[in-house]
A protein has these predicted regions:
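CBM-like, beta-strand-rich accessory domains located in the C-terminal region of large
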Residues: 93-94, 98-102, 110, 196-331
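Secondary-structure boundary elements
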Residues: 3-5, 19, 55, 151-153, ...
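Active-site donor-binding loop signature of nucleotide-sugar glycosyltransferases
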Residues: 161, 189, 218
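Short, acidic Gly/Pro/Ser/Thr-rich loop/turn segments
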Residues: 153, 166, 194, 223-225
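Alpha-helical cores of eukaryotic small-GTPase signaling modules
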Residues: 2-25
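Alpha-helical packing segments of well-folded alpha/beta enzyme cores
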Residues: 16, 20, 42, 73, ...
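Carbohydrate-active enzyme catalytic cores, enriched for enzymes
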Residues: 26, 30-186, 235-236, 243
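Cytochrome P450 core scaffold surrounding the K-helix E-X-X-R motif
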Residues: 186-189, 195-197
Length: 331
């Protein structure tokens, strides 16, 4: 008799979860913190509620759109992940391991047994089917994935250029990570730790800076505004294209166009327009290892022995110079 109000309590909890899943998750499956690891945590929180309902025979009390939203979140995460199951370390994200992610996919596959892509990742390709597309855009969340394969030999770029987000997000609109033939060639700087005192916060704030991401700054300052708008997304054809625009600073707008040419190489065009004055700085976070460079030719070339190398060639107005700066990568 002391649990006579249990149905009302249960309904209240389910109503709160259903409300939150609609508040926190955009219609493209992206979680509103725009942080891959927080996104992953949110998936599992919502899934645990389903697991408890299943254990007690109350699954039917969850509306279908609750399940549909979780499934779309899983597919979002699968798309932005790299072939080795790791994730871009945008915002406050930490690097996941393949072992951890296979375990997650196995649990998700039990919830969504008809989803062949989830089954594929759960079984490491032994069962299921990969998505029938390569590149994929999530326009509301502002995540865009160019790829020419789902395999380890893929060329894959993940671009982050979304709306204004929340505490776990960083001022990094336009940044990207690039995977090539088994290696992440433009790793994000990461986040260090969530919070602390003194030197800890100094380190966290260093990792949050716009200037330590693969994007453009004015006078190396953090972006004033982080509200990117997608002007064009064309994920098919010989020249796949993304054009995104952000009102980065007062009186200075940044338009970044990314072209994936012949499924082979990328051309990035950055245009800054406005009356603001100062130094425009284009930042690239290079991977750990030996790098050959030519300041006269504005060129970088990685020197990895395994052959997973890339050449970065920059072009710009007369007077443009190149400077090496220290970089750190927190995973």
């Amino acid at each position: 008799p002391e649990f006579k109000d249990a149905p009302a309590w249960r309904k209240s909890g389910i109503d709160i979860l259903n409300r939150e899943v609609n508040v926190q998750v955009y219609n493209d499956g992206g979680q509103f913190e725009l942080d891959p690891h927080y996104h992953l945590a949110a998936i599992n929180i919502f899934c645990k509620a389903l697991g408890i309902a299943d254990a007690n025979g109350f699954r039917k009390e969850f509306p279908q759109d609750y399940l549909d939203t979780i499934e779309s979140m899983i597919m979002f995460y699968a798309n932005i992940s790299f072939p080795d199951y790791t994730n871009p370390c945008f915002s406050d994200a930490k690097l996941t391991t393949k072992k951890e992610m296979v375990k997650n996919y196995k649990a998700w596959s039990k919830l969504f047994p008809k989803n062949q892509a989830i089954k594929y990742f759960a079984t490491e390709g032994k069962e299921g089917v990969l998505p029938d597309y390569m590149s994929k855009g999530f326009l509301k969340s502002g995540f865009f994935v160019f790829r020419n394969s789902w395999g380890m030999d893929a060329t894959q770029m993940v671009v982050k250029a979304g709306p204004k987000a929340f505490w776990h997000c960083q001022p990094d609109n336009g940044t990207f990570e690039l995977w090539f033939n088994g290696k992440n060639l433009f790793p994000d700087s990461g986040s260090y730790v969530y919070a602390g005192e003194g030197e800890v916060m100094e380190q966290r704030n260093w990792h949050r800076q716009t200037c330590v991401h693969n994007t453009v700054t004015l006078n190396n300052k953090n972006l004033d505004t982080t509200e990117s708008v997608t002007k064009l997304w064309q994920p098919e054809g010989a020249i796949q294209t993304l054009v995104t625009e952000n009102p980065s600073y007062k009186n200075l707008k940044h338009r970044r166009s990314v072209f994936f040419v012949d499924n082979t190489y990328f051309v990035i065009v950055d245009e800054m327009t406005g009356s603001a004055k100062g130094s425009i700085n284009l930042h690239y976070q290079m991977p750990k290892g030996e790098i050959a460079n030519s300041r006269e030719d504005m060129m970088f070339l990685t020197q990895f022995e395994d052959g997973s190398n890339m050449k970065l060639q920059c072009f710009g107005p007369d007077g443009m110079s190149m400077k090496k700066e220290p970089g750190w990568c927190s995973t």
